[in-house]
């Protein structure tokens, strides 16, 4: 498999790649409001030491960069009810796991201590369903302990490590497709968050953060190579159709902003996908 470039040279009519949300997946946070951030090299090292490298999806922790840049965050506009059921198929399990990690990043960025435990509980259930529960348990306990002491920067590191260890465990099981879906789930949930935040307080500059051509192409490519049986589902068909429409809406010249109505359309499209991930096709 060829390594994907996420922050390299882009076409003249495209912006530099940004994590929209809220990836992901595969998920660098800036500004004094979030405290002193670790160097990107340190974050990369965390993933490298666990065997998660450029052959896998980008780290979901990049959602912090976008959430921080869009502060103050209208938490109630970006939050959602956590899924209460565990999906029976591994594709939805992986997508849901990534989405809940992104929910955790939102909770930590907004410093909502009361929401930490519910996120950890749901994440544990999903990770067990994927067969990687033991890789999440120690981090969940540490996150709860650090939340009680309001050690938000350290909690962020635990969340980064959680995704990296889940990816590494899945790769160890030769489950690369599922590892990519964890990242995709985080990216989709992150995109829903950021479109909600931008729509609540719109400006052309804030809306530019939704333009991420290389990540969009990367995940569309991932969707096109999914298991044939999964591609027959309503979720996969909706994901493919809606992501292509999101790409159309956000493909702009550098001097043309994403309009407010387009931001709302993107939010609606990605929310439809996330609803199917969380609740299935019933």
Q: Where would I find each of the regions flagged by the language model?
A:
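A cross-kingdom marker for long, charged
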Residues: 228-282
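Bacterial N-terminal signal peptides
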Residues: 21-31
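Extended amphipathic alpha-helical interaction segments
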Residues: 148-232
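Secondary-structure edge/capping motif, primarily at the C-terminal ends of alpha-helices
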Residues: 104-111, 130, 134, 169-173, ...
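Long, amphipathic, charge-rich alpha-helical segments that form helical bundles/coiled-coils
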Residues: 86-103, 123-130, 134, 183, ...
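Short, charged, amphipathic alpha-helical segments
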Residues: 117-121, 141-142, 181-184, 206-213, ...
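Bacterial N-terminal signal peptides that target proteins for export
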Residues: 8-23
